[in-house]
């Protein structure tokens, strides 16, 4: 679309509510997300909330779920589904203190089945929280200055930032901006305090939501900050990504990338993953006006009729990248500068010990699929609690579901190392390169969207793939593999070298050819297949890779060069 052409506005916020989707009416009539949530929480007859309140509660980081392992049995017994709630914390950049960790641990043991989950967007999730415990959990988070606002819903979600801030002054500066961006973009409604803290409603002089208005964003909107050479946050998967540009170790500004998004629907070919497009560069002091300008374009022009078509990536591909850039610049009042050079060389976490420029040390631990839990042979949750009781630095959740024990003085390292060994937290030293670069979403039994297993299945599948790797001498080679229980892509499977997305119980789509640094989408290799076909395909392709790869060539690059899949140049061609 030509930048001067006025785009079609038949599906955006300019239209009357009755011309748009039902979710828009729900938001508009919710009294800024209040709905009837208080009444739903007070209803002791059911362990659930109403369908409309469940949608509104997403804006407060809460998903209503049920235990699908026993859903059919409860239905046969004519019982209500075993409802519970997932609660996600707002934690920009993934940073928390030992005191906060200890409180999170306590809340998980009291209200969430003795487990805590680290997410792919650098935060914590509590699962299996009962309705009557929601307020207690959220008020417990308030005690440690945390909340769950905008962790889900049609808003900014969690703001990501490359870890580890204390490895350099640049990291610290960018993390501080990411934290400010989260506070800057979070919704302003007083509903959160009224519902969860049981506060009185406060009168406001101006609009309750001066930026979002009554209908908020068309869909989720994700923001992330990357610091080259690390692309650990998968900046190209963000709706709005900022790539830090430094000069002599100091932050100069950011390249601006827009339109990333990895969700799709198998039955809808109009949906596809898309990598963000870099549209220019801004000086650091232009960051917050740029956030407002880009978000406001999506707020005003995003599709509010069809939620499958409502993400920013579709707005960009429909209106045209040139028009979107021009409209952003019009709202900014200045033109973006040309993109600055940068290079990404890694996407995963450097596990183990690293010393920062200030002399402090940091240890990145492998947390398989982000699940912090005690098992008979691995008391991980107890071990991390023991470390938090003596640690004087910070904890940092990584975008790969791992955990960094950060800011350790050299004199304190032996004590931390001893606890790691005592509780088996140093096992990353004996794991395969594939397992250390693996991720899985939660999926069954709690996620209502899952079509197949993910977190509960991937570790066993990896053991079988590791036998193949061992055969070909590839055990230590870093290869990214990501699995999700549905096509929505929470674990970012479409930019993995090996991606698996659930289609039905025991059945998955197999994707190959993603970029090791997160710079390229993969492509479907096999559709709707079970474990035998997956292992056979990986035996063939990995064996070929071991024999014929070029020096330094990653598996995803080889899969394309060898002709197993074609390179996906743009997201809209993903389904071709």
Curated annotation (Swiss-Prot):
The residues listed in the UniProt record as binding [4Fe-4S] cluster, with positions renumbered to this chain, are 441, 447, 486, 490
| InterPro entries, per the entry | CysI (IPR011786), NiRdtase/SiRdtase_haem-b_fer (IPR005117), Nit/Sulf_reduc_fer-like_dom_sf (IPR036136), NO2/SO3_Rdtase_4Fe4S_dom (IPR006067), NO2/SO3_Rdtase_4Fe4S_prot (IPR045169), NO2/SO3_Rdtase_4Fe4S_sf (IPR045854), NO2/SO3_Rdtase_FeS/sirohaem_BS (IPR006066)
Molecular-function annotations in GO: 4 iron, 4 sulfur cluster binding; heme binding; metal ion binding; NADP binding; sulfite reductase (ferredoxin) activity; sulfite reductase (NADPH) activity
Per UniProt, which keywords does this protein have? Answer: 4Fe-4S, Amino-acid biosynthesis, Cysteine biosynthesis, Heme, Iron, Iron-sulfur, Metal-binding, NADP, Oxidoreductase
Which reaction is catalysed here? Answer: hydrogen sulfide + 3 NADP(+) + 3 H2O = sulfite + 3 NADPH + 4 H(+)
Can you quote the record's cofactor note?
A: Binds 1 siroheme per subunit. Binds 1 [4Fe-4S] cluster per subunit.
PROSITE patterns tied to this protein: NIR_SIR
What is the superkingdom listed in this entry's lineage? Bacteria
> Does the keyword Membrane feature in the UniProt annotation?
no
**What does the protein in this record do?**
Component of the sulfite reductase complex that catalyzes the 6-electron reduction of sulfite to sulfide. This is one of several activities required for the biosynthesis of L-cysteine from sulfate.
- This protein's name: Sulfite reductase [NADPH] hemoprotein beta-component
Phylogenetic classification of the source organism: Bacteria, Pseudomonadati, Pseudomonadota, Alphaproteobacteria, Hyphomicrobiales
